[in-house]
Amino acid sequence: MNAKPGFTDYIVKDISLADFGRKELSLAETEMPGLMATREEFGPKQPLKGARIAGSLHMTIQTGVLIETLAALGADIRWVSCNIYSTQDHAAAAIAAAGIPVFAVKGETLTEYWDYTAKLFDWHGGGHPNMILDDGGDATMYVHLGLRAENGDTAFLDKPGSEEEEVFFALLKKQLKEKPKGYFAEIAKSIKGVSEETTTGVHRLYDMQKAGTLLWPAINVNDSVTKSKFDNLYGCRESLVDGIRRGTDVMMSGKVAMVAGFGDVGKGSAASLRQAGCRVMVSEVDPICALQAAMEGYEVVTMEDAAPRADIFVTATGNKDIITIEHMRAMKDRAIVCNIGHFDNEIQIAGLRNLKWTNIKPQVDEIEFPDKHRIIMLSEGRLVNLGNAMGHPSFVMSASFTNQTLAQIELFANNKDGKYKKEVYVLPKTLDEKVARLHLAKIGVKLTELRKDQADYIGVKQEGPYKSDHYRY
């Protein structure tokens, strides 16, 4: 299986992997009932006809099923991965072979990553996208910061705060020189909205809303219950240990593990390690989450306490500088360090660059300190479950991606009479319950049905929604 004759609008590692990718896409479809039901329900209506979706989300097999669902609903698509290590090359090849522009290679350089992101916005056939589907907010930030610089505020371009920002800001400077005047303004004007997949990207959206700089309506997919309480929790519960094992072949049972953060991702990560037989410690800044961790039986400590004690370290906070150089200096010889938050700045990777690095295998590095003690770093501090393993299972991603599809329909087809303003929204609970309902039969769940008198007694409709918006699941 090769690309369609004459179709060259893609960059993948090896297009000959497309057959392998297509077989795995077929397998994944069986495990993604929400997306398949969405195709069946909305396919004939073509609600995304005319949508030009710029997608920046891990180019995995599961994402391939999402892409083909969006296409089945009428959308035209361009796609990149939102992480330099998360692409599954056979998945990217299968999507390219189907004639969909995709620019994604496992192990991209940062320069390639941002060059590929820029390719999202120069549409095949001319023009620009009119929708963004984002994970982490990089595609959204590309337009917002590009427009800011185009409008004359360029001082920030000379003040990068990380290696990644150096590369990103260099690209923006290049674009300002090479693209026609008003390039970013045209893109910003053409886009109708963005749906955001993950916690980090959602924080960026709320920050822009607070500052009054958000350019379009946005739907926070992450805080749909059927995303955050399933993908973030149960997905991490399965994929974290998978990544650590594939990377290191270490015996988990009996090891001491430290998880920084006890939000949904941290909860899933701690459970993953406990189920593997680890003795798990947790650090937290939030007293509520700290109390939850303690009540679950975890030892709640600081990173300073854990550094000399733990064998395995996992960051899951969405914050920066959680594991510092000083922490790593205090760790045991060959302690394993990894991150399952979106960005690599949870671990002070930049401060390790002047030390001796020995690559063991792809996405596994041994770093030696001057005192000769070493640590094992997985995926250079980027997402361990996608860099060292295959990410979350298809079933749980079906729920997340069904939410993404519904969010794209809402913003593109249902934004009538100014329904959505330049603010951040969440999908209504009726859709959240619908997404859950679509996944029940696959795992043999039988719902109890409320009688009318029972529904009246608790003040809900028989068909739902069954909980108030402020209910905490």
Swiss-Prot record:
The cofactors required by this protein are: NAD(+)
Entry's EC annotation: 3.13.2.1
Q: What class of enzyme is it?
A: hydrolase
One GO MF term on file is:
adenosylhomocysteinase activity
Query: Which residue ranges traverse the bilayer?
Result: none
The entry marks the following residues as binding NAD(+), namely 198-200, 232, 261-266, 284, 319, 340-342, 385
Q: In which pathway does it act?
A: Amino-acid biosynthesis; L-homocysteine biosynthesis; L-homocysteine from S-adenosyl-L-homocysteine: step 1/1
Pfam families xrefs: AdoHcyase, AdoHcyase_NAD
The record ties this protein, via InterPro entries, to:
Adenosylhomocyst_ase-like_sf, Adenosylhomocysteinase-like, Ado_hCys_hydrolase_NAD-bd, NAD(P)-bd_dom_sf, S-Ado-L-homoCys_hydrolase_CS
| Main location group | cytoplasm
Compartments, as annotated in UniProt: Cytoplasm
What keywords are assigned to this protein?
Cytoplasm, Hydrolase, NAD, One-carbon metabolism
Record's function text: May play a key role in the regulation of the intracellular concentration of adenosylhomocysteine.
Q: What is this protein called?
A: Adenosylhomocysteinase
